[in-house]
């Protein structure tokens, strides 16, 4: 299994951290603000 060969550990760590960083930026910049706006607008509408 290639994931258990020590030569590939650094490659997997680099791609893993890169993927987590990209996902974190995408969620923080694009998806979560839209979800928050939707939640707040629904909250204000329900309080009327």
UniProtKB/Swiss-Prot annotation:
| Pfam families in UniProt | Fun_ATP-synt_8
Primary location: mitochondrion
What Gene Ontology terms describe where this protein resides (cellular component)?
mitochondrial membrane; proton-transporting ATP synthase complex
MF (Gene Ontology): proton-transporting ATP synthase activity, rotational mechanism
Localization recorded for this chain is:
Mitochondrion membrane
Task: Give the way it sits in the membrane.
Answer: Single-pass membrane protein
Key words, A-Z: ATP synthesis, CF(0), Hydrogen ion transport, Ion transport, Membrane, Mitochondrion, Transmembrane, Transmembrane helix, Transport
Q: Which regions span the lipid bilayer?
A: 13-32
**Oligomeric and partner information:** F-type ATPases have 2 components, CF(1) - the catalytic core - and CF(0) - the membrane proton channel.
For this chain, the family text in UniProt reads: Belongs to the ATPase protein 8 family.
Give the protein's function: Mitochondrial membrane ATP synthase (F(1)F(0) ATP synthase or Complex V) produces ATP from ADP in the presence of a proton gradient across the membrane which is generated by electron transport complexes of the respiratory chain. F-type ATPases consist of two structural domains, F(1) - containing the extramembraneous catalytic core and F(0) - containing the membrane proton channel, linked together by a central stalk and a peripheral stalk. During catalysis, ATP synthesis in the catalytic domain of F(1) is coupled via a rotary mechanism of the central stalk subunits to proton translocation.
Entry protein name:
ATP synthase protein 8
Q: Which organism encodes this protein?
A: Kluyveromyces lactis (strain ATCC 8585 / CBS 2359 / DSM 70799 / NBRC 1267 / NRRL Y-1140 / WM37)
